[in-house]
Amino acid sequence: PNVDIYNACEQFSLVKKYFGKTSGNPVFHFIVVYDAKSTWGNTYERAESMSRSIASYFADRYQIVYGIHNKPCYNKYGKCTSLYHAHFIMNSVSYIDGKMFSGNHSEIYAFLNYIERVTGDKSWKIKYGSGKEKTSEGLTASMQCD
């Protein structure tokens, strides 16, 4: 919500260069999977509204963009699991003061609590990692911005 999606990578890089923080993890990538049944239903408008609210958690300090996918509702057992999920890409360097986002446990769990409040769903689970190890879901600190 605070970046031109067509120039996000360039804008992220300019902030990093301004603060001299060009090494390390370039972005923080996380995915929120919305539960079509218990959370809010299956409309794109609701998914977009939730995604905007979730992105606003970081938007006052970090540049962030998101995209929403609509997936078929059936898993291999024929049950509806989720129609929508959103990918969020956040600059790892704050545009306010150049502070790097650490993604430590306290930051992640504070964010998880925020998602629970926004969605009204208390069943969130979170796993995160570099993506280079075992498969991760939920929040992932990986992705290159070239």
Question: What is each PLM-predicted segment?
Answer:
Residues 1-146:
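N-terminal nicking endonuclease/strand-transfer module with a His-rich metal-binding environment
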